[in-house]
Structure formats: structure tokens, C-alpha cells
């Protein structure tokens, strides 16, 4: 069962990512140690898509290095 969008957002915010806004249901998360923007789209209660989970996993790995 896929995780929810709100869970991905919580994981990003827990390690220091900051939501820098976006349009509609899109959110842009930035972190000083991550060289790219992590974009999450969808309503918080929606299921996360596989590419979104992959992007978050990669960003968390990048920050932990």
C-alpha cells in the first residue's frame, strides 16, 4: 500500500526541508544541503506515486551524506 502525500511531506520537513510554495497542489521543498528542488504534487490525503516516493528517498539520502 503506497504512503500518503502527507507522510512524504512530514519526512521532508523532519530533516529540514522548507516548503517554498507552488501552484495549486504542487509544493516545492528546498534544503541547503540538497542541490535540487523536491516537488511534491497532490492533495495530502492522496496516495503517493512511485516516482514521488523515489524522489523523496533520493533527497533524504542526499541530505544524510
Regions found by a protein language model. Give the residues of each.
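Basic nucleic-acid-binding interfaces
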Residues: 2-21, 30-65
Amino acid at each position: 500500500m503506497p504512503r500518503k502525500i502527507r507522510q512524504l511531506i512530514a519526512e521532508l520537513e523532519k530533516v529540514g526541508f522548507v516548503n517554498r510554495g507552488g501552484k495549486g497542489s504542487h509544493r516545492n521543498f528546498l534544503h541547503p544541503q540538497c542541490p535540487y528542488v523536491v516537488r511534491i504534487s497532490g492533495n495530502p490525503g492522496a496516495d503517493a506515486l512511485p516516482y514521488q516516493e523515489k524522489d523523496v528517498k533520493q533527497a533524504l539520502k542526499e541530505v544524510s551524506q
